[in-house]
Structures are given as C-alpha cells and as structure tokens.
C-alpha cells in the first residue's frame, strides 16, 4: 500500500499481525468508500470507535453483505460459535459453557515457534492459553447478541493437535 494509492483499489485485505491494522488505519488517510476486510483481531469487538462488522455470516449475514469494513472472526471463535449460536438463538444457554477444542498446526499463527513444527507436534497434544484465550470475548459478544441474558462463563481449553488442518470442538 505504500506504492499504490488507496483510492486506486476497491478492496483492501489486512492479513497482518494483531495490532497492525489499527495502526495502519490511524496513520493513513483511508478513503471512505474503500472496502476493508481485516483478518486480525483488531476490530472484532464492537465499539463506537469503529464501524467494522463482525463477519460471521451465520450471525451477521445481512450486515456483512452491505458492510464497508468487515472484521473476520477468529478460527476457534468461528468453530465454537457455529455450535453455540443455535442454542443462544433459542435462549437455551442457561449456565457456564465448557469447550475443549483442538486445532491443527495451520492454526498456530504467523510466527513460527517450537510448538508449531511438526517434529514437536507429532504424537503430541498440548494445552495453551487455558481459560484465557483471545477468542473468548468475541464468542461472548456473539452469544449475547442472540441471547441478551447470557452472562455466564465460557471455560475454554484450546489444544494444539498433531494434524495439519482443521479444528474439532466439543
């Protein structure tokens, strides 16, 4: 984007590390009609400070279709919400929610690390960010959108699996 004027493009995809989209938006004169799709977590939580729509079609289909700015949901958040949103829509979430989910190595993010290499993951399953994963706030936000009375805990334990792609949640 440093070499191409922003008013010369139709859609801008941010496939950047968390925090970089927000920095870019604050430091550049972004045309009002430029469509933006952000894959980071910068704009997933609704706020009066931005006009990004949470882009989970199963939740916000109409708004996503007409939005200028779309915040792409997180991987675990998408998987978990696809199972829980029908319950929230029917007001069936009446207590704490417990989720165990395992992700393949492609869900490890953009920075390579010891735990993202196949030689380490092979025949291993490991827990990370138990009860403190960054996707929990966006899951809670979506559940409250459909079931305003939902105010329970989401006890989420994410695991790294020894397979390359996909997520399994229960």
Pin down the residues of each PLM region.
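N-terminal Rossmann-like NAD(P) cofactor-binding subdomain of oxidoreductases
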Residues: 1-123, 128-130
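Charged docking surfaces used in two-component/phosphorelay signaling
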Residues: 107-170
């Amino acid at each position: 984007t440093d070499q191409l004027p922003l008013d010369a493009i139709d859609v801008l995809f941010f496939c950047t590390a968390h925090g970089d989209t927000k920095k870019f938006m604050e430091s550049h004169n972004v045309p009002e009609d430029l469509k933006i799709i952000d894959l980071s977590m910068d704009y997933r939580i609704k706020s009066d400070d931005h006009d990004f729509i949470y882009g989970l079609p199963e939740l916000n289909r109409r708004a996503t279709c007409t939005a200028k700015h779309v915040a792409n949901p997180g991987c675990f958040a998408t998987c978990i919400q696809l199972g829980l949103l029908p319950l929230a829509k029917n007001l069936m979430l009446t207590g704490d929610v417990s989720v165990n989910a395992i992700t393949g190595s492609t869900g490890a993010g953009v920075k390579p690390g010891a735990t993202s290499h196949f030689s380490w993951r092979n025949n291993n399953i490991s827990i990370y960010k138990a009860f403190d994963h960054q996707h929990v706030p966006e899951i809670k936000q979506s559940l409250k959108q459909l079931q305003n009375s939902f105010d329970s805990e989401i006890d989420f334990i994410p695991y790294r699996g020894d397979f390359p792609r996909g997520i399994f949640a229960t």
